[in-house]
Amino acid sequence: MSLATIAENYMMHNGNQRAIVPYVPPPYAYANAPTLGGQAGEMESMSLGILNQAMSSTTGASRALKDEKAAFGAMAEALRDPEPIRQIKKHVGLRTLKHLKIELASMRRRYAILRVVIFMSGCVTMATSMAGGLTIIDNEIYEDLSGDGWLSKTIHGLNLLCTTMLLAAGKISDKIQEEISRTKRDIAKRESYVSAASMSWSGDTSVLLKEVKYGDS
């Protein structure tokens, strides 16, 4: 073996040790883990489609259209959530729906009572106001009422009391009406989420939206 061959073999085996920057082989390139691109992409596209439908359909000026947008948003949220979170929200939502419906029935009873109070207060206020107006037109009625001081005071007191009750009951009924609308919207959202969480990919659903009422109906 010649000296040139020996030198070439030596440089081949020991060249990396004499290099200024030693050669480091690259790490082994592992294959990427499989992703759920198909199913996740399909769910995201469905969620975006539902949100686009909710945002671009109408302006949502009325309460019914606002409730419809809330239902669309709940369904989009159900399609976007992972399966474990979806099932947890479904079971919690079913429990919450019972309490919300009980609260809604209680608020409707209070609202009905307030409407009766408003009607009766309005009738008494109108009657006492008419009695006070007749005293201005007819002098005989004015003299009769002036002679009976307790009757005049009673009429004015009833007028003041019923007017105050009318204003107070009107404000309270407006607040209860807002709470009723907000509660009905929450019920519609949770029922839509439960329906979407129970929906199969074929479009069937095991929990149907029954007795969902929007707006003031």
UniProtKB/Swiss-Prot annotation:
Pfam families in alphabetical order: Orbi_NS3
Free-text function comment from the UniProt entry: May play a role in the release of virions from infected cells.
Family stated for the protein in its record: Belongs to the orbivirus NS3 family.
Name of protein: Non-structural protein NS3
Record organism: African horse sickness virus (AHSV)
Gene assigned in the entry: Segment-10
